[in-house]
């Protein structure tokens, strides 16, 4: 059991090393897109299932409240938090539409969708991306494995941040780190701080 625990740490470290080589450019591009979105008076919508729903909520909380510096709140909405809306849509229509219907109601041109799926194949996240495209929103896709069907929906103006791993737990661990990198870049760009602090 102890060896298995150590192996989990080692795998996680190696996945982060691989991600540190593969992902910085796409993370920086996504952060810059988010900064421009926010400067333009727009908002970021985020969605995912299970642990990815938790990541969407984590990202939105960091923007709405604060990350590491005191600053004004920034507009971000996690689409996985309203159980009445989610269960109504799932019951009356389909679970695949729980995010897309919210995007059709809330999304505006210039907004960004942060679409999170470790496999890239979550049906409701794919539908969310399709709805975002119909609203002239930009997409930042946080994926893993081979990018799945989500990768095929992205255009030149969108960004995929694909974790170089096939292990769901390792992908989720890097997704959280990516979210923190995005928040850090957004904060430091919008609210430059003295590096001594």
From Swiss-Prot:
Give a GO molecular function annotation for the protein: zinc ion binding
The SIS domain sits at 34-196
What SUPFAM superfamilies does its record include?
A: SIS domain (SSF53697)
Catalytically driven reaction(s): 2 D-sedoheptulose 7-phosphate = D-glycero-alpha-D-manno-heptose 7-phosphate + D-glycero-beta-D-manno-heptose 7-phosphate
Q: What is its EC number?
A: 5.3.1.28
Q: In which pathway does it act?
A: Carbohydrate biosynthesis; D-glycero-D-manno-heptose 7-phosphate biosynthesis; D-glycero-alpha-D-manno-heptose 7-phosphate and D-glycero-beta-D-manno-heptose 7-phosphate from sedoheptulose 7-phosphate: step 1/1
Q: Which family does it belong to?
A: Belongs to the SIS family. GmhA subfamily.
Binding partners and assembly: Homotetramer.
| Stated name of the protein | Phosphoheptose isomerase
- Organism equals Shewanella oneidensis (strain ATCC 700550 / JCM 31522 / CIP 106686 / LMG 19005 / NCIMB 14063 / MR-1)
Q: Which gene encodes it?
A: gmhA
């Amino acid at each position: 059991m102890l060896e298995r625990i150590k192996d989990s740490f080692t795998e996680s470290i190696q996945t982060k090393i691989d991600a540190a080589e593969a992902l910085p450019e796409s993370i920086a591009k996504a952060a810059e897109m988010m900064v421009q979105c926010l400067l333009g008076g727009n908002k970021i919508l985020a969605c995912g299932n299970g642990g990815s729903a938790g990541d969407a909520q984590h990202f939105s909380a960091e923007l709405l409240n604060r990350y590491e510096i005191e600053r004004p709140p920034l507009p971000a909405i996690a689409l996985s938090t309203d159980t009445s809306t989610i269960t109504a849509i799932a019951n009356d229509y389909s679970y695949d539409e729980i995010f897309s219907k919210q995007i059709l109601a809330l999304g505006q041109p210039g907004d960004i969708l942060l679409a999170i799926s470790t496999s890239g194949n979550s049906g409701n996240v794919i539908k969310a991306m399709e709805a975002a495209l119909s609203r002239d929103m930009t997409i930042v896709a946080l994926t893993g494995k081979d990018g799945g069907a989500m990768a095929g929906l992205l255009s030149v103006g969108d960004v995929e941040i694909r974790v170089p791993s096939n292990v769901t737990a390792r992908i989720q661990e890097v997704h959280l780190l990516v979210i923190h990198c995005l928040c850090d870049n957004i904060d430091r760009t919008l609210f430059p701080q003295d590096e001594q602090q």
